[in-house]
Amino acid sequence: VNQNLYALLQSRFPADRAARCLILPGGEAVSYGALEDGVGRMAALLRAKGVQPGDRVAAQARKSPAALMLYLASLQAGAVFLPLNTAYTEAEIGYFLQDAEPRLFVQDAEALAREAESVAPLDHTHPAGPDELAALVYTSGTTGRAKGAMLSHANLAANALALVEAWGFSSSDVLLHALPIFHVHGLFVAVHCALLSGAPMLWLERFDEDAVMAALPRATVMMGVPTFYSRLLAEPRFTAEAAAHMRLFISGSAPLLESAFAAFEARTGKRILERYGMSEAQMITTNPLSGERLAGSVGYPLPGVSVRIAGGGDGGVVEIRGPSITSGYWRNAEKTRDAFTADGWFITGDIGRMDPDGRLWLSGRANDLIISGGLNVYPKEIELVLDDLPGVVESAVIGLPHPDFGEAVTAVIAGSGDEGAVIAAARAKLAAFKTPKRVIFVGDLPRNAMGKVEKAALRRQYAGLFG
């Protein structure tokens, strides 16, 4: 059996290829047949440009139907697809091109699609073995240089099949797709669920309140980062009526604030389904489709995925095993070795605890851990207290160098308030060693492309606060 992911996706396309695959804001649509034809022509063009199986194809392209076709064409041709954030500068791109050594670097997928129109479609799909690489996804690189997580055809297929089942996708779904397609969430999780189900996607170039509100009546499922949901909640047109017909709202890529979960349920009567994943493993756990979705929890391991807490008990590093997890980092044997335990489990670097029934709760990143006066402080615990205070939109708790404590607990708060009052309110609920020594008020917290708060940037900015 050909293990190529594109062969699997194609086998699930609707028998009637006139069925819509991508529906654009202007009302135009790309049928499954047109998608298939465009992919085949682009795959043939990749071959003509010298792309052989195993070669890397890098793309830093505007989100468009052509950009999606390029990804699928890369799979069909047996190349390794390398999606790059459209916000990266030339200097940043230089690192990825040097590290991955792609055969081809595409910045204009539409131009490539036009060129491919005159090429006969590739008449076969590269027969991939299960361990053959399909994609190279560079991690956000919050610690030093970004590393390229290697994902095989089998890795991607296993996760996609598990998600379709876990989230109950079918051909009667319509997915509202406003995510970027340069990362796991938008390119793999969202796209694969739709294509495996033969379902259409409402294809928005980016999240824009007007476009999302216009598309919502036709959708059944929406996937988003937490920022999408906080923006919808700030939108008066987003009412219980506007959301009533929706089957599912899914959130991931960054932690969903418990206050946002509660506000969303109060507004719509629906609970956002939060799930947990990372570039190296794709999706790991999910709250249940039917069953209790709890604020602050990322739910249960997907079928085939095993999760354990290092050191067991009430808080430790989350370690995982399963068919969707990377074999390691591109040309980086040392980082690959460091990423796995002696018995072969992948070390996520996330801190969490597990309920007896297997439900997972996360409390931050291991590298965000603050050690103050020799005591471990988990920022998430403090952030939950601060986020409940009046005037606080969102908080980020970091450790800053301190001559006496080693690290001092410091809160950076988006919002307004009085430093002394915030510290007093926190002290009423937290041990002294966990209470922020200083509170800094800002307009907005800095975020990376995935909507994650960039604590490393805050640590650099305020490094000298305590002398």
Language-model regions, residue ranges each:
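Gly/Ser/Thr-rich phosphate-binding loop
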Residues: A219-G224, L233-R293, S306
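Conserved AMP-binding A3 loop
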Residues: A29-G33, A134-L161
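Conserved AMP-binding/adenylate-forming
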Residues: E28, A43-A91, N376
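Conserved structural elements of the adenylate-forming
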Residues: L35-R41, A149-S170, A178-F182, F188, ...
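Conserved AMP-binding/adenylation subdomain of ANL enzymes
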Residues: A157-V174, F182-V221, E235-R237
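AMP-binding/adenylate-forming catalytic core of the ANL superfamily
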Residues: G277, G316, G322, S327-G328, ...
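Conserved ATP/PPi-binding loop(s) of AMP-dependent carboxylate-activating enzymes
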Residues: Y300-G304, G312-A339, V377
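Conserved pre-ATP/AMP-binding loop-to-beta segment of ANL
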Residues: R17-A18, P121-Y138, R145, G168-V174
